Amino acid sequence: VSLDDNIEKGETLVGLSVIDNPVVYIIFRDKLKKDTKEALSSLRDLNVNKIIMLTGDNEKTASRIAKEAGIDKYYSSLSPQDKLNIITSASDDDRPIAMVGDGINDTPCLANADIGIAMQSGNDGAISEVSDIIILNDSIDSIVLAKKISINTLKIGRQAVLIGITTCIILMIVATFGVLPAIIGAICQEGIDLISILWALRAHKQVK
């Protein structure tokens, strides 16, 4: 097998030479984490419409990884500034942009995306300061979990507001016609506020 075949497969070659004479070649192959493809599929089920990979890897490697993972689109051989330009351009769209990064070079992109998600190394330095979400591991499944938590929290928050507004309107109507004494109405209002708060606390329930 020639070295060109390895390059065509998207593998990275490192050569060791002695006095300009090649002695050995080391072949590196980026491998997908076992949960990657399933996690990306789960994100699509949660209405993540498009998944794009921005990488500094060469075209062949990027193409192979994107194909194996089922990524919609990819950009290869990018510098940090190139990535930032793409994020900035994509932000002109009406849809929110989430950026996932795991290195200090991703800091500008995380800062400029609508939602910056730092993974593993995001608990150190500048990257943690600009990120909206910090995931303390390198599992893509954790991004799916974060998405589920955000959906659940928003849903419960809306329900709590709806409960409060609806019951307040009912109390106002009842009080207007003198059916309910003012002091009883005030007590009911406090009770409704407490119910709304307790309802909102359901967001602490573990999402799976």
Language model features by range: what are they?
Residues 5-8:
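Short loop/turn motifs at secondary-structure junctions and domain boundaries
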Residues 166, 190-201:
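Hydrophobic transmembrane alpha-helical segments of multi-pass transport and channel proteins
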